[in-house]
């Protein structure tokens, strides 16, 4: 997938207050978020489907790709831009055969072996983490900075770092060679999602200037 801007990659969290949830996404897009991944691990299928349609309406307005976490059925049903799968989700190779060559396929990896396998199975990018402690995912594997650098060097596809990234620590990843910052709480729980997005993007752009 060419020209995929992964600079600031938003992964959503729980959407209990739908109006607030959709507003956060829109504000983050105004602040420069370049990809949105809709992640709903507990939602009923119909609720997820309806929410995904609403989120897609917003992302299309800003010409930003919408990725669905894990649920290939939802991604296909709403014609999302792609799917992201973890190590315990549908195998990447199977996901690719289901979504076709034109959709974006992202894969989570926590080590070089997983990253290389994802590349072989035609992933368009890899999400590596958790680079910092995170409350979003209880079972997240910790990936030291040294390991992150080695993963980046081991593959030819883009890598985004995820896990506990904030405006305060993002600069610590400056020399890792990553293609983007993937965040959840730093935007979803920010008082001002637009400004939070702008600041995170500034941190990332600063290291790439």
Curated annotation (Swiss-Prot):
Q: What is this protein called?
A: Thiamine-phosphate synthase
- What one GO molecular function would you report for this record? thiamine-phosphate diphosphorylase activity
Function of this protein? Condenses 4-methyl-5-(beta-hydroxyethyl)thiazole monophosphate (THZ-P) and 2-methyl-4-amino-5-hydroxymethyl pyrimidine pyrophosphate (HMP-PP) to form thiamine monophosphate (TMP).
Which domain of life does the UniProt lineage start with? Archaea
Family the entry assigns: Belongs to the thiamine-phosphate synthase family.
Q: Identify the residues that bind 4-amino-2-methyl-5-(diphosphooxymethyl)pyrimidine.
A: 37-41, 69, 108, 137
Q: Does the keyword Hydrolase apply?
A: no
Q: Which gene encodes it?
A: thiE
PANTHER family, A to Z: THIAMINE BIOSYNTHETIC BIFUNCTIONAL ENZYME, THIAMINE-PHOSPHATE PYROPHOSPHORYLASE
* Originating species: Methanobrevibacter smithii (strain ATCC 35061 / DSM 861 / OCM 144 / PS)
Q: Kindly state which keywords UniProt assigns to this record, in alphabetical order.
A: Magnesium, Metal-binding, Thiamine biosynthesis, Transferase
Q: Name one Pfam family in it.
A: TMP-TENI
């Amino acid at each position: 997938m060419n020209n995929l801007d992964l600079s600031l990659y938003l992964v959503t969290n729980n959407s209990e207050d739908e109006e607030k949830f959709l507003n956060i996404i829109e504000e983050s897009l105004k602040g420069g978020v370049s990809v949105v991944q809709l992640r709903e691990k507990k939602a009923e299928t119909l609720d997820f489907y309806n929410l995904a349609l609403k989120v897609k309406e917003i992302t299309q307005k800003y010409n930003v790709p919408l990725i669905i976490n894990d649920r290939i059925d939802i991604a296909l049903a709403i014609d999302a831009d792609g799917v992201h799968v973890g190590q315990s989700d549908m195998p990447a190779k199977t996901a690719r055969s289901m979504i076709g060559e034109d959709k974006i396929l992202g894969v989570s990896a926590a080590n070089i072996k997983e990253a290389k396998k994802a590349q072989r199975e035609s992933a368009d990018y890899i999400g590596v983490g958790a680079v910092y402690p995170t409350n979003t995912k209880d079972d997240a594997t910790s990936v030291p900075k040294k390991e992150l650098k080695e993963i980046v060097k081991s593959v030819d596809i883009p890598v985004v770092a995820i896990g506990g990234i904030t405006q305060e620590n993002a600069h610590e990843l400056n020399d890792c060679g990553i293609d983007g910052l993937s965040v959840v709480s730093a935007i979803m729980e920010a008082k001002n999602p637009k400004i939070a997005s702008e600041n995170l993007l500034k941190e990332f752009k600063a290291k790439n200037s």
